Amino acid sequence: MRLFKGIIGLVFIFLAIIFVYDIRFAIIFVSSYIFHELWHLILIKSFHFKVEEIHLIPFGGQIKMNCKKNHSPLIDAFIYLAGPLGNAILLVLSFIIKSDNLKMINLILFLFNLMPIMPLDGFYILVNFLALKLPYFYALKICLIISIVFASGLLILAPFINYCFLILAGYMLFISLNEFISSNFYKGLLLERIVDESNNNPNKEIKPTIRLKKMLY
């Protein structure tokens, strides 16, 4: 297992926050960021999934795991929900110790991560709840459309809120559109393969399945 790949990205965040705010604010932000990812890790380990690497990037952390067998989307939803829950715990703590910086940072992280925009936790929470009733592909497609709408709205509002959100919104809109286009391309290839196999083996029953072995949180 390779732990904490991408430390340079985390250092970049730390230095950028020091430049804009101060070192105390930067320490609280990075600590809250790591605490958020730690709660994802705790839930993943509690379900006995194997963690391959933890990758810290400027736009959020990624925990790569290997699933030996399929599992309920509800488990994935709980794992994605664990990160914002960690921020909620720190938010409660901020009221106890009366820390305005801790309160503001974790309130923003809590609300921001629950937005249904890819690659935020809120997006994958919604995908997995919909996947309880719909095929995963269609749940993903619906959520990508929602993600594009929300990211576009955030991009429009960002200049009136904070210019940092302008960069984030642009990034999230880009990956949402890219994933939407890629998923259409993937489905086309899958259907083409199914048609080819059915033509070559007209008497064979074809059951296309997708087994997800590696997930990112």
Where are these regions (language model features)?
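Hydrophobic transmembrane alpha-helices and their immediate loop junctions
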Residues: 1-217
